């Protein structure tokens, strides 16, 4: 039988997405198709329209067929009182299974990848996983940090304060080609959307990336000759800018934003060449005022942060805004449970209001909360806050998303989401 035509938007309202983190949900879905099917039915029944399936966690290995990336074989999982390795026992195509089961219940499917990552250093003496740790010949792909004691590869940072994802250098052409191929492989699937997460510089922020590759590219970009690297740009160990950034620093920040801008443009074009119907988008933190430290300008190029008083922005920083290369955008409105309403950053409503202002109609966007890790959310018990969280975000943007499914399940927030979506749908004109 032919599938029923989709209801027009005025009957279904704006899209409502739930994020399904690969690592956090691994134990439930790595080898249980029935559980995937049952949970997707429940997701649909409470009123979500879309799922976002993470298929490349921070180790950089993948849960779909790729010509260049290795299949994900294990993740570190918190069990009882410590982290343990859990190995994948399922042999089915994880992403294809989500697509198949979602189609049966009428959910749209978006796949997300962690973009500029290539490995993960685990706490509790578990060791590490990922391409960068397995292939020593690719150490030059990893970020180089401008640390207090000198330049150092993130692969040489092994202290307890350095646990977590190992980032790749976004300016490295080999890295870009590798990640682009992963994205092209993903675009071969029957997806509604592809979303880039962590399409940015390292978690070390302003300390990244000071490799020889980045130095050479910066000199080419800026016309500045760096004779005393990295001090030409920043003193060793710099983690924050003073109130007045110098011209070279501003040019450096512009350069980093141009690196990410050009990659997003390239990735968007690559996806649309393979399948023009796949929507291309990104996840970013909605805290624009400080997101420059990640090398990202997610705004419209029509928005000028310099004219808006941001002291770190050069005259050309606005040209690195990449909103016009995206079909949709997810803004992490990750405010605390008691910071739902407001007009500024670090309120959910304020994040979304600012998003609309900065994106200038270039792209549809939606904001949403992190209901497991943000202030006030970490211990559950916040079901009463969910309907307002939905209302604050969905009315200011073009949809709503929530991170993460595992928290809905852990804290049994299903009924709260159903109430929030039902309340919203009552306001939609029939």
What spans do the regions from the language model cover?
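Bacterial Sec-dependent N-terminal signal peptides
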Residues: 1-11
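Active-site-adjacent "subsite" loops/lids of carbohydrate-active enzymes
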Residues: 10-33, 111-189, 245-246
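Hydrophobic faces of well-ordered beta-strands that scaffold small-molecule active sites
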Residues: 16-20, 51-53, 109-111, 194-197, ...
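Short, acidic/polar
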Residues: 26-44, 173-185, 302-324, 348, ...
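Catalytic domains of carbohydrate-active enzymes, especially glycoside hydrolases
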Residues: 34-61, 189-193, 318-331, 393-400
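Aromatic-lined carbohydrate-binding/catalytic grooves of carbohydrate-active enzymes
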Residues: 48-90
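Polysaccharide-binding and catalytic clefts of secreted carbohydrate-active enzymes
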Residues: 144-325, 332-335
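Substrate-binding cleft of secreted/luminal carbohydrate-active enzymes
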Residues: 312-430
């Amino acid at each position: 039988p032919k599938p029923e035509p989709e209801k027009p938007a005025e009957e279904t309202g704006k899209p409502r997405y739930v994020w399904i983190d690969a690592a956090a949900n691994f134990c439930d879905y790595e080898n249980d198709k029935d559980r995937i099917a049952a949970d997707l039915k429940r997701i649909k029944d409470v009123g979500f329209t879309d799922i976002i399936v993470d298929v490349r966690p921070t180790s950089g290995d993948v849960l779909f067929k790729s010509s260049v990336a290795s299949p994900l074989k294990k993740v570190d999982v918190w069990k009882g009182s410590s982290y343990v390795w859990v190995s994948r026992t399922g042999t089915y195509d994880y992403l294809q299974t989500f697509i198949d089961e979602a189609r049966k219940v009428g959910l749209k499917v978006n796949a997300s990848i962690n973009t500029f990552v290539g490995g993960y250093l685990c706490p509790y003496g578990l060791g590490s996983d990922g391409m960068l740790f397995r292939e020593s010949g690719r150490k030059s792909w990893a970020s180089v940090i401008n640390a207090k004691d000198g330049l150092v590869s993130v692969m040489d940072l092994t202290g307890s304060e350095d646990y977590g994802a190992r980032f790749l250098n976004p300016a490295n052409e080999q890295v870009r080609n590798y990640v682009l191929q992963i994205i092209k492989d993903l675009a071969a699937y029957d997806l509604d959307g592809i979303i880039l997460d962590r399409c940015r510089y390292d978690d070390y922020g302003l300390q990244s990336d000071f490799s020889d590759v980045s130095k050479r590219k910066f000199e080419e970009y800026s016309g500045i000759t760096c004779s005393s690297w990295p001090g030409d740009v920043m003193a060793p160990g710099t983690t924050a800018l003073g109130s007045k950034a110098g011209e070279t620093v501003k040019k450096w920040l512009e350069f980093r934003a141009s690196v990410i801008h050009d990659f997003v443009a390239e990735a968007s074009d690559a996806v649309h060449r393979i399948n023009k119907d796949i929507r291309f988008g990104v996840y970013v933190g909605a805290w624009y005022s400080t997101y420059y430290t990640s090398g990202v300008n997610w705004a419209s190029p029509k928005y000028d942060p310099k004219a808006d008083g941001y002291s770190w922005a050069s005259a050309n920083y606005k040209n690195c805004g990449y909103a016009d290369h995206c079909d949709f955008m997810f803004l992490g409105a990750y405010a605390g449970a008691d910071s739902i309403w407001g007009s500024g950053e670090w309120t959910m409503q304020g994040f979304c209001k600012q998003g609309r202002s900065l994106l200038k109609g270039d792209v549809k966007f939606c904001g949403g909360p992190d209901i497991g890790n943000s202030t006030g959310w970490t211990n559950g018990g916040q079901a009463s806050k969910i309907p307002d969280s939905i209302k604050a975000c969905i009315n200011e943007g073009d949809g709503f998303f929530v991170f993460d499914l595992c928290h809905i399940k852990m804290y049994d927030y299903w009924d709260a989401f159903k109430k929030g979506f039902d309340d919203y749908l009552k306001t939609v004109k029939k």
